[in-house]
Amino acid sequence: MKRAVMALSGGMDSTALLVRLLADGYKVDCLSYRYGQKHSVELERAQLNIEYLETQNINVTHRIIDLTSAMSIFESALIEGGEEIPEGHYEAEQMKATVVPNRNAIFASILYGYALSVASREDCQVDIALGVHSGDHEIYPDCRPEFYNAVEHAFALGNWDSEKVGFRLPYLEGDKVTILKDALNATDILGLNFDLIFANTNTSYNPDSEGRSSGKSGADIERILAFNKLGLADPVEYQTSWDEVLSNALEVEKVHKDNEYRERLTQEQYYVTRESGTERAFTGMYWDEKRSGNYYCICCNHLLFTSQMKFDSGCGWPSFHTEHPRAGIKHVQDNSHGMQRIEVRCSKCDAHLGHIFNDGPRAYGGQRYCINSASIDFKEREE
């Protein structure tokens, strides 16, 4: 049987990782850490899921490691006695206050030592599994790929038999949506109750005395948006209704993204994509572009068109007869300016792209995507 040891925080990501490992046939040992965190309710939630798994005849060894005396001397808003937990978007600058210095290096070091011990005792290979993901990279340096590459190298140099253990980080390039999709699949394979398992988790950095999530910390916002992206209501208990926490999360996301767009885009790009404006004909940089390559959304880098789909319509705006198969461009009825038209918007970030008309090449279905140059970014294909 395959063997794994992992850090089970009691949050969404590590819980999803646990059910994935079990679905993949691993025998799993879990370590949870008590380090003086304000949201220690996560440890109770972790134990609830271990107990639920036992009722389903799935046995997982679970140990809680007490690091309070060591880590309570660290400075972080996440630790008892630290400053108040900031609210807002999970990528906002103020969320750096929730970084606990060197936390993941400490956790990984203990896991590595435990994995070596299991490998020696059971004479087997052991995977060290962690649920870190791309959404953590912006704020938490110890969740980035280069950190784990360096840590694994250092630990291998400092231990005998290091060839028997290795890191397994399946979500490193994914996000919370990726994680939830994976958990849905894993719980289905195992015949487990997805809602019950994720009701028994805590992601909030500032739950109330009853363990209910605030819905306002950066971690909450990211989780709420992930559930909503999949058309799901989060089964965890919040201090207010799901509709209220979702409305707040969507507004926080909108404001954060708008601030980002204002900083990054030119005035015309912002006007076109975020205010549904239109550039003047024959003024955009791509209306007569002839090079081979791909066209991406200027706001979110989502692939929209390829140069093979572009044609010269003579209208003064970039014209395409087909969208990329994975573009999923949204079509929206537009009755502005006394006209009836079909607006096209990016499916990923809702950027206004232009309009679609029925005067395109018949050989390709007769449609013409009339796109603002300001809404797209062209990347030339290397020969």
Task: List each model region and its residues.
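ATP-dependent adenylation/nucleotidyltransferase module used to activate substrates
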Residues: 1-194, 220
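Short, surface-exposed acidic
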Residues: 59-61, 190-201, 267-273
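Local cysteine-cluster metal-coordination motifs and their immediate loop/turn environment
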Residues: 109, 203-225, 295-304, 350-351, ...
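Short linear capping/connector segments at secondary-structure termini
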Residues: 131-134, 204, 278
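Accessory C-terminal segments flanking Radical SAM cores
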Residues: 182, 186-229, 234
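Iron-sulfur (Fe-S) cluster-binding segments and ferredoxin-like electron-carrier domains
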Residues: 212-245, 304-313, 354-355, 374-382
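A short Gly-Trp-Pro
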Residues: 253-383
